């Protein structure tokens, strides 16, 4: 979440005339994140988050907003899109598709403990179950086809060692078979900065704009690679097990998922290594923006490749 497209107080006042939310009191840009423009919007009716979508088209976005509504109505702590006076959750502001959603309680954590990992593992499992009844098709815009294309873009910038690792990982993914794994709607970006913790509870899961249909294990791997990683980019076994045990208690993990676990952690690390390399070498213009360090996921990928047996050994206590 960053500010690529500037919105003035007066523009926001005018836009809010299409909603029944009262008078605008405050408008504040949110600098964290890397894809869309976001503002905190405070009116005399409450606090909301405004998102202007920098990459998605207006045709793609209703599915994401419908998914958030679907999950919120089933008890998942996620933002609820606010409909305007015409009954639509999606509008346009400064030439960009735009939406308002409810603002949730809590804050993101820099140093999650095992109890926080267990809490997010439980919520992710509940989200996967709730998402099973969401019928709209949503393809993974950061899937294998995107990874192959992005690898070709960033490869010229890599040193010889990382170029070899990139090629080896692409070859691994070419033969990595996930067809037998349980599939469904996934968040696909469940980092710490996309979760608001309210004490030891999950106050909210935000930023559903990479959500898609894919292997549920991929969603778990993306989250574990951020929530359960030590300072040296190795996995913390205590936090991993807390996360997986809590998830497994809600949606039992399968033997096929256990066998695929080390490989899925590699795929998840590769996806974010590539996106961070792409953001570094091909940045978007913006007012309050920042690119995240790709070296973090480079190290996570190296560990995932080297530590396959140790990764397999840290799993749920019962299948």
UniProtKB/Swiss-Prot annotation:
Gene3D superfamilies: 3.90.1200.10, Phosphorylase Kinase, domain 1. The keyword ATP-binding applies. GO terms for molecular function: ATP binding; homoserine kinase activity. Disulfide bonds: none annotated. GO terms for biological process: threonine biosynthetic process. Belongs to the pseudomonas-type ThrB family. SUPFAM superfamilies: Protein kinase-like (PK-like). It catalyses: L-homoserine + ATP = O-phospho-L-homoserine + ADP + H(+). The keyword Membrane does not apply. It is an enzyme of class 2 (transferase). It comes from the Bacteria. CDD domains: HomoserineK_II. This is Homoserine kinase. Keywords: Amino-acid biosynthesis, ATP-binding, Kinase, Nucleotide-binding, Threonine biosynthesis, Transferase. InterPro entries: Aminoglycoside_PTrfase (IPR002575), Homoserine_kinase_II (IPR005280), Kinase-like_dom_sf (IPR011009), Pseudomonas-type_ThrB (IPR050249). Pathway: Amino-acid biosynthesis; L-threonine biosynthesis; L-threonine from L-aspartate: step 4/5. Its EC number is 2.7.1.39.
